[in-house]
Amino acid sequence: MKKILILPGDGIGQEVTNECLKVISYFQKDCEIEYTEDLFGGASIDVHGEPLTKEVLKKAMEADAVLLGAVGGPKWEQLEHNLKPEKGLLTLRKELEAFANLRPGKVFPALIDASSLKKSIVKGTDIFVVRELTGGIYFGEPRYIKEVDGKKVGANNLIYSEDEIARVARVAFEIARKRRNKVTSLDKANVLEVMQLWRDVVSEIHSNEFKDVELDHLYIDNAAMQVIKRPSTFDVILAGNLFGDIISDEVAELTGSLGMLPSASIGNKYGIYEPVHGSAPDIAGQNI
């Protein structure tokens, strides 16, 4: 028996997961699948006062997979940082150790006219973004907004350990072996020490374990330009949490719509599966 925890979340999330349930129900004819549904994100805040309760986290850790709709919306934007719907998602990823986010961005011939770029540029584009998901600046401590000498100061810390970098790099290289055998790692090693560590560790993993895979490195600002200029030349893109968050949305736009793409966040044991898009409150409830 396989167990799936369904967390519709907010906005269009309920409609999205309802459609997924039709697929799950179809496979129940031949597979033993049990699913439960619970509150998450803003929907959980409205009832329980927090985006992710201990009870829901326990259910997630007992499930074989988590199916997520979407979280967030204008209704909860003014809440304190640790009470926002997105905080529940960050905590869920961290607690399940879902350290690698996988996002494909493929331009299909039938949908090429939906792309914002010319056909001649996006034709043949098939990019797979591997984003480190449970480390980096989104989780680094200390983090604060405080007053110093009468002025507000905000700070976040961009921190990565060797192990955090190595494990997500291995995921990227393994995926590349099953595709076109190339990894492009993104960093800012020219100005950030932590990004120099990123580059060093990725290079070491490549040299010791994946010499058969082609590896190149790009600074994130140059990469953002090259993905627009020559998208079809990329295969697997490896990036840290912040850079991966940004570049994966850019890659998604090449395909024509962020709303049509899937996302998987995986670790050694757990997996979280969701659409790439947000809660889309402007069209929620319209069943489209």
State what each model feature region is.
Residues M1-G9, T36-D38, G42:
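Generic N-terminal amphipathic, Lys/Arg-enriched alpha-helix
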Residues M1-K3, D30-C31, M61-A65, E97-F99, ...:
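Short coil/turn connectors at secondary-structure junctions
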Residues L5-K22, Y26-Q28, D149-D221, R230-T233:
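Glycine-rich phosphate/diphosphate-binding loop of Rossmann-like nucleotide-binding domains
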Residues D10-G13, D64, V130, A172, ...:
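Buried hydrophobic positions in well-ordered alpha/beta secondary-structure cores of metabolic enzymes
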Residues E32-K54, V227:
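N-terminal beta-loop-helix "entrance" segment that forms/cooperates
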Residues G41, A110, L218-M225:
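Short acidic loop-to-helix transition motifs that present clustered carboxylates
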Residues G42-I45, V227-I288:
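Glycine-rich phosphate/nucleotide-binding loop
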Residues D46-A155, L242-G244:
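N-terminal glycine-rich phosphate/adenylate-binding segment common to multiple enzyme folds
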